[in-house]
Design a protein with these regions (language model features):
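Long, basic N-terminal domains or extensions that often function
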Residues: 1-300, 304-308
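Short hydrophobic beta-strand segments that form the core of ligand-binding sensory/regulatory domains
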Residues: 6, 312-317
Length: 317
């Protein structure tokens, strides 16, 4: 039965300027891997998540077993497989190596059966082909391969090496501490970065009780928000920050370039906006200098009045 799948990798704080891109790539890599292996229904939808301490993806309508697939192997030219005396020794050896020796003496023009040999032209010569039916992969194997590929292809700015408690050395963007993989209510026992998957996730570093057990894949996001004080969606967290900045500005104009909003979104898991201020005397400094240092050094949001001049208030998240 097709069910929702969630995969989450919990880490130390990831590079904020790369977080959004890492989250999107992680989700896209797992989705494409599962789709290529036949685990997704046509209506399956993948949603990416990224917070300072996690990369995750949720995929709807994931099959527990991929469908059986037809495999076509191009074996050898007909002239090498058959001569005047019948089937050649080379062809028999080839079929034995494929575990299909019983088909070596079959007609090369067979037209039915799940496993069969047949002759077809490749446009230049006639070849012997083997058609076989490969059993579909189980999800644990398909996800294990897809997860490994997705991690390997992540656009990580700079890898770091770290040691796990068992002494093994791992390379990743930041140390990874936990892997969650749930298909419906079931744990998918995959492994990555020397971690074995379970159903435990990490809540907010300060505002939650820490470890949180997740009952089902669909419960992951709401449980993380309600009990873990973590908004997992990068887009939802960003939208909340923008909305709260506008409210806190109290009629002033918030100077919030997109790259600053994205960076701040990548620095917090449960955003809350505060108002700060500085001595009016500092407004004698060119406002461009003040805005630059607030944005680049403090990640603050400067405020401007109706006249466009800088105020001595600022907002921080």
């Amino acid at each position: 039965m097709s069910e929702t799948l969630v995969v989450e990798l919990c880490t130390e704080e990831l590079p904020p300027k790369a977080l959004k891109r890492l989250g999107e790539a992680f989700a896209a890599g797992i989705e494409s891997g599962l789709r290529e292996r036949g685990f997704l229904d046509p209506e399956s939808v993948a949603t990416s998540y990224a917070t300072p301490r996690r990369l995750a993806v949720s995929v709807t309508c994931v099959r527990p077993v991929a469908p059986d697939a037809e495999v076509i192997d191009k074996l050898m030219p007909v002239r090498a497989a058959r001569d005047a005396s019948g089937i050649t020794e080379a062809f028999s050896k080839k079929m034995k190596g494929l575990g299909r020796l019983h088909l070596a003496t079959a007609s090369l023009d067979a037209t039915d059966g799940p496993d069969r040999v047949y002759i077809a032209s490749d446009g230049k010569a006639d070849y012997v082909y083997l058609r076989s039916l490969a059993k579909g992969q189980v999800l644990v194997r398909g996800l294990d391969e897809s997860l490994a590929d997705a991690i390997e292809q992540l656009p990580i700015p700079k890898l770091m090496s770290y040691q796990r408690p068992n002494g093994s050395t791992v390379k990743f963007a930041r140390p990874a501490h936990r892997l969650l993989a749930l298909h419906g209510t079931n744990i998918v026992p995959v492994s990555a970065l020397d971690l074995d998957a379970g159903r435990i996730t990490d809540g907010h570093r300060f505002q939650s009780r820490g470890e949180l057990p997740i009952a089902t894949a669909e419960a992951w996001e709401p449980t993380l928000a309600a009990e873990g004080k973590v908004i997992a969606s990068f887009g939802e967290r960003r939208a909340r920050i923008v909305a709260e900045l506008e409210i806190a500005a109290a009629g002033a104009e918030v100077i919030m370039p997109d790259d600053l909003v994205d960076e701040v979104t990548a620095l917090v898991e449960w955003p809350k906006v505060y108002t700060g201020g500085f001595d009016l005397a500092f407004l004698e400094v060119p406002q461009e200098c003040l805005i630059l240092t607030m944005q680049r050094n403090q990640r603050y949001f400067a405020l401007a009045g109706p006249d466009g001049r800088l105020q001595n208030r600022f907002l921080l998240v």
